[in-house]
Amino acid sequence: MAYPTPPQLSLPLPAYEIGGYHFGQRLRRRIILWATHLGDDIVQPAGTPVNAIGDGEVVWAEMRAGSAIKRNWGGIVVVGHTHRVTQEPFYSLYGHLRDLTVTVGQTIGTGHPLGAIAESYTAANGWWKIPHLHFAIYTGPWRNIILPGYKRPEQFRTKMAWWQDPHAFVTKYNQLS
């Protein structure tokens, strides 16, 4: 699938400060490795607009509310892009959003509004404690299924090699000639 090719990428928020989990952080329950986080959690006030990092096509946009017992994404958007150097597809993922402004199949440009960071303990936030954006970059195969926010050791539907440090990916992409 050929998606639009962004000439440059931008960060999804003007203030990119990781206030929650960061990419690759190992999450433990007691002393047991429970999972590895697959993106950056950027803590910002609820209502902060979230924008697309580059030209692309929306491949997923929906509300996955979950519950207070089984948390989920809330509002999630996944955008497909074509890398300008490798010509390979990659995907930007934005989770815990309210007021989604895009639909599947829509072609969007850099900076296009996707939604806003949702309030804590709401369906749009997926019932998480702190309002934040989960931002991730996925370079694996698109199978038209929801992508996870973390990788558990016993999970085999994703691989760590398919996930990139999102801030480093954006920075490196913009330095390539």
Where are these regions (language model features)?
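Short, well-structured beta-strand-loop connectors
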Residues: 49-60, 102-117
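Residue-level detector of beta-strand face positions
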Residues: 41, 49, 78-80, 136
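Short hydrophobic beta/alpha edge segments that flank linear recognition/processing sites
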Residues: 76-79, 109-125
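Zn2+-dependent peptidoglycan hydrolase active-site motif and core
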Residues: 52-98, 128-132
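Acidic, glycine-rich catalytic/binding loops that coordinate metals and/or anionic ligands
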Residues: 4-9, 14, 103-109, 116, ...
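Short glycine/threonine/proline-enriched tight-turn/helix- or strand-capping micro-motif at secondary-structure
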Residues: 18-52, 61-63
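Short alpha-helix capping/helix-loop boundary micro-motifs
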Residues: 43-44, 94, 99-102
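Solvent-exposed coil/turn segments that connect beta secondary-structure elements
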Residues: 47, 82-84, 138-141
